[in-house]
UniProtKB/Swiss-Prot annotation:
It comes from Arabidopsis thaliana. Keywords: ATP-binding, Cell membrane, Endoplasmic reticulum, Membrane, Nucleotide-binding, Transmembrane, Transmembrane helix, Transport. Pfam families: ABC2_membrane, ABC2_membrane_7, ABC_tran. The keyword Cell inner membrane does not apply. Residues 65-329 form the ABC transporter domain. GO terms for molecular function: ABC-type transporter activity; ATP binding; ATP hydrolysis activity; ATPase-coupled transmembrane transporter activity. This is ABC transporter G family member 26. Homo- or heterodimer. PROSITE patterns: ABC_TRANSPORTER_2. Residues 414-623 form the ABC transmembrane type-2 domain. The keyword Cytoplasm does not apply.
Length: 685
């Protein structure tokens, strides 16, 4: 690496030109940060010294983020005037909003900037607006946002979106996959198709090594009720998941929450390496240790949505010292700043004017916060705005480059092949769960024993066998309905995250999900019917047996589609279960067994019930209208059609029920897809 002075003017401004291995000259400010913006610079690249672990050709496009006067507000929930408790709660929640416009203001004029090689920490007490600002920077909140945000002086756009990585506070990783599988599937879905398989695996290996994930690479990620890797390892896996695609801007929401001090410091060292590779890193942080605090390049302190400090982190204490606001005892700088942001003045010395104001006004917290906001407005904000307007202009080639959308899109079929493998691998433990197998086969054996060698020679025996038919319909309707209704509510957070990152088309996800789940909805009913059919001695006719099995499969698949539709329409585990129970009860009562003669004003319900059509089709497949029974009675033989069990059913035909079930199976899935599309588009993590 060659370093040389460029011009006298540059020398005066402490600017150096750095020549990398690619021979391009780069202007950079001569400061400790790996990347700093230079008002005289027209070309920027990455210093080899800071990317020793990341190949230069894989370095991300530098992004200079500037944000000015950012405001965000949300509409207040209108409590019912009839409910006194809700009205009181609403008033308490919205007391901070003096504007009578029906909105609560979360962010109130945030200004700042950051660039490649820097870690910007957003710090403040809980509820101050840190995460909200982070989501706005990541393009995840767009409604009711005011102010100006630019990326290399270009507003947010879909092309910018592809260059942003977002690590949520809760690690959103599929729990049943191993760390290596998680990264591998992400690589094959997100990396360009121009990269070979060997290159993708090499990149995975490099990231696993750099983030210290070698020991847990073949361990399940875990989460919830699934045992897996530790919290620190899971957080590093989340970061690896994002930097796999070389994001230019990496946003992290509380990455150290839940970690001990050592793990948190180690994680921040990793983020320093990520930043030195040419990325812009922004993280929210609640209360870092003093060691971690000094690892930040820039700091934005937020108090009740207002900025209280913005600048270099190491200069924050000097700034407040200039205001004569000092800790009276040895104190962690982060703890001191958080006390200021919340208005706490214990063990903090204040200037005389503040002490006088405190004496005159009993609310000392408000006095301090108001003072900090005023000083920020007069001392810091004008300088930052002037720098952004005059000197911090992104080079033209970076402005052009960021508007080029990264062509990472695989074909629909390629996405389907990759995602179907991942879906099956994630859910295969549920598909072949021992309890599920015992339940299905155990119930089949019990039913076979209860209806052992059942007959249709008398009305009573026929009624018993028809009851078995209806129970089979109930069993596989409920099993398939409840097996599918929770799929999308459970996977909502994973789907929202991956859709925000544009990993795949929603249609690919839905088709993979429904086809992979169909494995269980086909295998278990098939084995179930093989056991019950021959133990109960149904019609011993091969075509009849095959059509009976196919009918049960059609009922199960239609029930699966209905469950997916109900789950996608609410995306809530609790509400999905309640709605599914109600629908199952209605379909069960109108299925044609308990009530054959439904009142006319209620008959419309049975036409919505796939159990009604499935039960009728099952009877038509199993029995023939001219089949004889009661031959030993005084009146002689009768046809099955004359039985009271079939008063409302014509045992001939069956095509109508078949087509209706097929239409329902397809229609429910179509409705589920569009409901899922609408719901996911408005969901936020």
């Amino acid at each position: 690496m060659e370093i040389r002075r460029s011009t006298e003017e540059v020398e005066e401004n402490h600017v150096m030109q750095i020549t990398g291995s690619n021979g391009i000259v780069h202007n950079m400010e001569f400061m400790p940060q790996a990347y700093l913006r230079n008002q005289y610079s027209s070309e920027i690249d990455i210093d080899e010294e800071f990317v020793s672990t990341y190949p230069l050709e894989d370095a991300p496009l530098p992004i200079f983020l500037k944000f000015e006067d950012v405001e965000y507000k949300v509409r207040n929930s209108h409590a019912s005037s009839a409910n006194l408790v809700k009205t009181m709660v609403s008033k308490v929640v919205t007391h901070t909003n003096p504007d009578p416009d029906g909105y609560k203001h979360i962010l109130k004029g945030i200004t700042g900037s950051t660039g490649p090689g820097e870690i910007l920490a957003l710090m403040g007490p809980s509820g101050s607006g840190k995460t909200t600002l982070l989501k706005i920077m990541g393009g995840r909140l767009t409604d009711n946002v005011k102010g100006k945000l630019t990326y290399n002086d270009i507003p947010y756009s879909p092309s910018v979106k592809r260059r942003i990585g977002f690590v949520t506070q809760d690690d959103v990783l599929l729990p049943q996959l191993t760390v290596e599988e998680t990264l591998a599937f992400a690589a094959f879905l997100r990396l360009p198709s121009s990269m070979s398989k060997e290159q993708k695996y090499a990149k995975i290996e490099m990231i696993i090594k750099e983030l210290g994930l070698e020991r847990c690479r073949r361990t399940r990620v875990g989460g919830g009720f699934v045992k897996g890797i530790s919290g620190g390892e899971r957080k590093r896996a989340s970061i690896a998941y994002e930097i796999l695609v070389d994001p230019s801007l990496l946003l992290l929401d509380e990455p150290t929450s839940g970690l001990d001090s050592t793990s948190a410091t180690k994680l921040l060292h990793i983020l320093q390496g990520v930043a030195k590779a040419g990325r812009t890193v922004i993280t929210t942080i609640h209360q870092p240790s003093s060691r971690m605090f000094h690892m930040f390049d820039k700091l934005l302190l937020i108090s009740e949505g207002h900025p209280a400090f913005y600048g270099k982190a190491r200069e924050s204490m000097e700034y407040f010292s200039s205001l004569r606001i000092l800790p009276e005892i040895a104190m962690n700088p982060a703890e001191f700043l958080l006390d200021l942001a919340t208005g706490q003045v214990s063990d903090i010395s204040l200037p005389d004017e503040l002490l006088a104001a405190k004496t005159a006004q009993p609310d000392s917290e408000e006095v301090l916060l108001k003072y900090l906001k005023q000083r920020y407005k007069t001392d810091l904000e004008p300088k930052e705005k002037e720098e952004n307007h005059r000197n911090r202009k992104a080079p033209e080639h970076l402005q052009i480059a960021i508007q080029v959308k990264k062509d990472w899109t695989l074909s629909w079929w390629d996405q389907f092949l990759i995602l179907s493998r991942r879906t099956f691998r994630e859910r295969r433990r549920d598909y072949f769960d021992k309890l599920r197998l015992v339940q299905s086969l155990g119930v089949a054996v019990v039913l076979g024993l209860l209806w052992w060698k059942s007959k249709t020679d008398t009305e009573a025996h026929l009624r018993d066998q028809v009851g078995l038919m209806f129970y089979i319909c109930i069993f596989w309707t409920s099993s398939s309905l409840f097996g599918a209704v929770y799929v999308f509510p459970f996977e909502k957070i994973y789907l929202v995250k991956e859709r925000k990152a544009e990993m795949y088309r929603l249609s690919v996800y839905y088709v993979c999900s429904t086809l992979c789940d169909m494995v269980a909805h086909v295998l278990y009913p098939t084995f179930f019917m093989i056991i019950v059919y021959f133990m109960a001695e149904f019609n011993r006719n091969i075509p009849c047996f095959l059509f009976t099995v196919l009918t049960i499969l059609l009922i199960a698949i239609t029930s699966q589609g209905a469950g997916e539709f109900l789950g996608a329409s609410v995306l809530s585990i609790k509400r999905a279960g309640m709605i599914a129970s109600l629908v199952l009860m209605l379909f069960l009562l109108t299925g044609g067994y308990y009530v054959q003669h439904i009142p006319k004003f209620m008959q419309w319900l049975k036409y919505l019930s796939f159990m009604h059509y499935g039960f009728r089709l099952l009877l038509k497949v199993q029995y023939s209208a001219d089949q004889l029974f009661e031959c030993g009675s005084k009146g002689g033989c009768r046809t099955l059609q004359s039985s009271s069990s079939f008063d409302t059913i014509n045992l001939n035909g069956g095509l109508q029920e078949l087509w209706v079930l097929l239409a329902m199976a397809f229609g429910y899935r179509l409705c589920a897809y569009f409901c899922l599309r609408k719901k996911i588009s408005i969901c936020h993590l």
